[in-house]
């Protein structure tokens, strides 16, 4: 039996709800998608619960599930994935965090959790922090830039713990939180103390940074703090090839996703101009995926722009990103052709009016290039896909891909 190549396209935060300004259509309903519409004619489709109905997924736990890795068994926290994706090489005992460059006032009250989101000086600020903070109380500290305002921090030393709380309050108008131990161990208490000292040191350095003085002169918010969250120690994950026998590559610009994919053994490629934002190189990513399909059994293509727009409440931005998804699919079909399996879905819903993740199911489409009993679905959107035959969980996705690509192993005799 011929085995087919696989394209798995995940648009971050794709799922949505009816939007008042769109005459109560969802963003997917409001955008014409001719290329995806053609795929629907020979697809099975429906809705997917990334974790389980009603559970609000993080992008980390949902991607693990979609890749066939049970997050309830393996998930320890997001920080390690972010750090690996940003270029860190973690070792046992290290504690990693994800963070944002943010803006606070003199009392450490948060004004903007993302410092206006646009922090062109982020790499230079990271370099400045690394040059001025080598260690805190004997614990080695290293900063890594991710994308835009995002940063990862790694603590290295003996006797550290990831059982500590965030310094990020997750809202504005309140003070930066003090990290606290979440268990009674000495290691957790020491790590929380180090993190609090680190936070104060970061503020002192960034507040006096010439780079931030220039930002203020330009009328921009200073990036004068790093809000930290998602403490996690390194955990070995199953390798994708070991449980699928599929050689896979990933196309992504997002540190978290790059970290997960790297850790499970995918070859990660970030094309020139891919940013993880609305200004990303959409077509360049599609072209890179098409090229990789000639070399690998499966290519995972990730797009962050839909989620970024949703978190900002940017309706027009989400509509634009969705229109570009259709163009990306069209570009893959132009270059590689249609003789492959294509799955299109989201990792979670981020309704543009809510601006946060929700536990809503997300759209799911699986196109095959041969005769199947296709679903009678007219459009790729949240309402139409309720007519489809599928209501699956994230952990089901890999099995579906293996089955329809004829790469499965029989269960039983």
From Swiss-Prot:
Keyword terms of this UniProt record: Glycolysis, Isomerase
E.C. numbers: 5.4.2.12
Top-level taxonomic group: Archaea
Gene3D superfamilies, alphabetized: Alkaline Phosphatase, subunit A
Protein task: Catalyzes the interconversion of 2-phosphoglycerate and 3-phosphoglycerate.
Pathway the protein contributes to: Carbohydrate degradation; glycolysis; pyruvate from D-glyceraldehyde 3-phosphate: step 3/5
Gene name tied to this protein: apgM
Protein name: 2,3-bisphosphoglycerate-independent phosphoglycerate mutase
GO molecular function: metal ion binding; phosphoglycerate mutase activity
Gene Ontology BP annotations: glycolytic process
Keyword Mitochondrion assigned: no
Reaction(s) catalysed by this chain's protein: (2R)-2-phosphoglycerate = (2R)-3-phosphoglycerate
Natural source organism: Sulfolobus acidocaldarius (strain ATCC 33909 / DSM 639 / JCM 8929 / NBRC 15157 / NCIMB 11770)
A Pfam family matched in the record: Metalloenzyme
HAMAP family, A to Z: ApgM_A
């Amino acid at each position: 039996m011929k085995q087919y190549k696989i394209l798995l396209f995940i648009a971050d935060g794709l799922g949505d709800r009816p939007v008042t300004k769109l005459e109560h259509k969802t963003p997917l309903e409001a955008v014409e998608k001719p290329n995806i519409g053609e795929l629907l004619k020979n697809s099975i489709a429906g809705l997917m619960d990334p974790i389980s109905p009603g559970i609000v997924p993080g992008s980390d736990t949902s991607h693990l599930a979609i890749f066939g890795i049970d997050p309830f068994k393996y998930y320890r926290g997001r920080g390690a994935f972010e750090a690996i994706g940003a270029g860190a090489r973690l070792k046992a005992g290290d504690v990693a965090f994800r963070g944002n460059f943010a803006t606070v006032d003199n009392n450490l009250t948060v004004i903007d959790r993302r410092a206006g989101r646009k922090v062109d000086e982020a790499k230079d600020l990271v370099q400045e922090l690394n040059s001025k903070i080598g260690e805190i109380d004997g614990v080695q500290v290293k900063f890594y830039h991710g994308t835009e305002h995002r940063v990862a921090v790694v603590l290295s030393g003996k006797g550290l713990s990831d059982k500590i709380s965030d310094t990020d309050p997750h809202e504005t108008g309140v003070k930066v939180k003090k990290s606290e131990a979440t268990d009674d161990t000495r290691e957790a208490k020491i790590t929380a103390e180090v993190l609090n000292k680190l936070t104060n040191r970061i503020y002192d350095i960034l507040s006096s940074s010439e780079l931030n003085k220039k930002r203020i002169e330009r009328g921009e918010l200073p990036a004068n703090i790093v809000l930290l969250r998602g403490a996690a120690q390194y955990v070995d994950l199953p390798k994708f090839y070991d449980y699928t026998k599929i050689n896979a590559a990933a196309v992504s610009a997002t540190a978290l996703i790059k970290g997960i994919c790297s850790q499970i053994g995918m070859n990660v490629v970030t094309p020139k101009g891919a940013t993880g934002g609305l200004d990303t190189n959409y077509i360049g990513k599609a072209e890179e995926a098409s090229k990789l399909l000639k070399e690998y059994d499966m290519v995972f293509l990730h797009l962050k722009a839909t989620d970024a727009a949703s978190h900002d409440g940017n309706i027009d931005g989400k509509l634009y990103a969705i229109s570009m998804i259709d163009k990306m699919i069209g570009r893959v079909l132009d270059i590689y052709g249609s003789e492959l399996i294509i799955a299109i879905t989201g990792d979670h819903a981020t309704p543009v009016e809510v601006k946060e993740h929700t536990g809503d199911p997300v759209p799911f489409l699986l196109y095959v290039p041969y005769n199947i009993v296709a679903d009678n679905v007219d459009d790729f959107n949240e309402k139409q896909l309720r007519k489809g035959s599928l209501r699956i969980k994230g952990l089901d996705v890999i099995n579906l891909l293996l089955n329809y690509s004829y790469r499965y192993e029989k269960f039983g005799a």
